[in-house]
């Protein structure tokens, strides 16, 4: 019997390796459904249009999906992002730092799995130092940035 899988990927908004991986999962696990906080169909692979994509969460936070600092606000959106897991045999989460927030309202004991496509680059010490020196020069920007990346230490 085929397993029905719910796949969560935080944002489908570009044409990268993580999006290709999600597409391969959808191709190989027929009948699976994708859940995401952000889906920008014109900015990602055309193939996504073949699959059922459920955009969940609060619309307000979607405008922050392109800001590395403010993506942490999706933590708040996690509290209202409910996936009907009773319809699925497995729940697969793609994460690199914020995807696991979806677990606040969604967990299927023994049936929830997460994979990391790439570590959260913004939590790397060298990248933090570079960002503080080159991107976040004023005190307000530095403070917000440090608060955001401190979550991952």
Q: What are these language model-derived features?
A:
Residues 15, 22, 98-102:
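Short, well-ordered alpha-helical microsegments
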Residues 12-13, 28, 39-42, 96-99, ...:
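Short, solvent-exposed loop/turn segments at secondary-structure junctions
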């Amino acid at each position: 019997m085929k397993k029905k899988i719910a796949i969560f990927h935080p944002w489908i908004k570009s044409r990268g390796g993580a999006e290709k991986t999600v597409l391969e999962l959808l191709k190989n696990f027929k009948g699976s459904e994708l859940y995401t906080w952000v889906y920008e169909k014109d900015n990602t692979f055309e193939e996504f249009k073949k699959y059922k994509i459920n955009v969940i969460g609060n619309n307000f936070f979607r405008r922050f999906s392109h800001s590395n600092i403010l993506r942490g606000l999706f933590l708040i959106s996690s509290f209202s992002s409910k996936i009907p897991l009773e319809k699925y045999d497995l729940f697969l989460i793609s994460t690199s730092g914020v995807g696991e927030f979806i677990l606040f309202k969604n967990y299927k004991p023994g049936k929830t799995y997460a994979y990391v496509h790439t570590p959260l680059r913004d939590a790397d010490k060298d990248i933090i130092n570079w960002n503080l020196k080159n991107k976040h020069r004023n005190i307000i920007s530095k403070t917000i940035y440090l608060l955001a990346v401190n979550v991952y230490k």
